[in-house]
């Protein structure tokens, strides 16, 4: 008895193309905030929980809160609320809607003794993030992280486009 055994193998090489992170430019606003007399973890948790229920803008891509790590930092006791939007137009529209929202105004009044943020003093800029979020490992369970900011200005004759090209 003769057997013929045929085997065929196929190696299909798949190359997963990662998106170019430099293609994403976010409109980001930093809003200064001051802790009030009723500022504590419990009140902040309640405040944020209620705030999340008020947010309807899908263009709001991310929000982070920053508290000073030391009283020697450049902004003293000012905390920051970072809002990351899909565009400046989306941010402006959402802010207009927020200002006209009776529930949002009631929320602000309710938590005025916990945290006071100055929406008029928002510091806007375009953000390009040249690293993937997991570049330094997985995010810890607490959600806390350290960040540091260095303010720079473009040299004469250079622009944002030159900086992005450099990245």
Model-derived segments and their meaning:
Residues 1-7:
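Bacterial N-terminal signal peptides
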Residues 9-80, 84-167:
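Short S/T/G/P-rich N-terminal loop/turn motif that feeds into the first structured element of a domain
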């Amino acid at each position: 008895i003769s057997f013929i055994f045929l085997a065929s193998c196929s190696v299909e090489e798949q190359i997963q193309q990662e998106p170019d992170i430099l293609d994403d430019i976010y409109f980001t606003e930093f809003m200064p905030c001051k802790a009030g007399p009723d500022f504590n973890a419990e009140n902040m948790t309640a405040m944020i929980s209620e705030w999340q229920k008020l947010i309807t803008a899908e263009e709001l891509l991310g929000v982070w809160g920053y508290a000073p790590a030391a009283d020697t930092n450049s902004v003293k006791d000012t905390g920051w609320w970072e809002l990351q939007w899909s565009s400046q137009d989306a941010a402006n529209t959402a802010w207009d809607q927020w200002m006209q929202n009776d529930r949002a105004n009631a929320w602000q009044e309710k938590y005025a003794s916990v945290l006071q943020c100055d929406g008029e003093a928002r510091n806007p800029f375009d953000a390009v993030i040249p690293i993937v979020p997991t570049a330094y490992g997985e995010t810890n369970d607490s959600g806390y992280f350290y960040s540091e900011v260095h303010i720079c200005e473009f040299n004469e004759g250079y622009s944002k486009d030159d900086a992005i090209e450099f990245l």
